[in-house]
Amino acid sequence: MAEKEKIKRNRREEILQALAQMLESSDGSQRITTAKLAANVGVSEAALYRHFPSKTRMFDSLIEFIEDSLITRINLILQDEKETFNRLRLILLLVLGFAERNPGLTRIMTGHALMFEQDRLQGRINQLFERIEAQLRQVLKERKLREGKGFIVDETLLASQLLAFCEGMLSRYVRSEFRYRPTQEFDGRWPLLAAQLQ
């Protein structure tokens, strides 16, 4: 019984990896059908539905992976790093680096892969970015408590500016067919961003 469950889990992972790879390829700029996905995996559409009740559920699983990866690591950054600007820099680098290592998932993060899917999926991505923005805002607000100095500009505005930078870099990555890496020249960009936060 355990062996059967392991095979099923492996097939599920194989399906999700195939979907992510298709999103990374030129197929990712178009609607991915279950027929195309089944052909890519080398199984029938019926076999896909034995592992996932719908394509929406496949996207849900990929979004869950994105959420778990980012939020877990953001929490580790907040736990390990105490200095405000280092926290912010590491959170931005985390989001950009994750996208760079997972181009297919970046299409989901930017919403490009979800244009032809259920609105609920886009809502989940919106919630993810709202959570990241809330974390950035909290880091900014905690500066006064941790370091004894606040910001001239409202923390809400600053957090949205940092998130907009991230989202812009992810969109550029997708638009360029993954040529312009999100972390490219980050070391030069960060001082410009940090200067806006003073």
Swiss-Prot record:
Residues 33-52 bind DNA. GO terms for molecular function: DNA-binding transcription factor activity; transcription cis-regulatory region binding. GO terms for biological process: cell division; negative regulation of division septum assembly. SUPFAM superfamilies: Homeodomain-like (SSF46689), Tetracyclin repressor-like, C-terminal domain (SSF48498). One of its GO terms (cellular component) is cytoplasm. It is found in: Cytoplasm, Nucleoid. Its main location: cytoplasm. Residues 9-70 form the HTH tetR-type domain. Residues 117-144 form a coiled coil. Pfam families: SlmA-like_C, TetR_N. It comes from the Bacteria. Belongs to the nucleoid occlusion factor SlmA family. HAMAP family: NO_factor_SlmA. Homodimer. Interacts with FtsZ. Required for nucleoid occlusion (NO) phenomenon, which prevents Z-ring formation and cell division over the nucleoid. Acts as a DNA-associated cell division inhibitor that binds simultaneously chromosomal DNA and FtsZ, and disrupts the assembly of FtsZ polymers. SlmA-DNA-binding sequences (SBS) are dispersed on non-Ter regions of the chromosome, preventing FtsZ polymerization at these regions. This is Nucleoid occlusion factor SlmA. It comes from Serratia proteamaculans (strain 568).
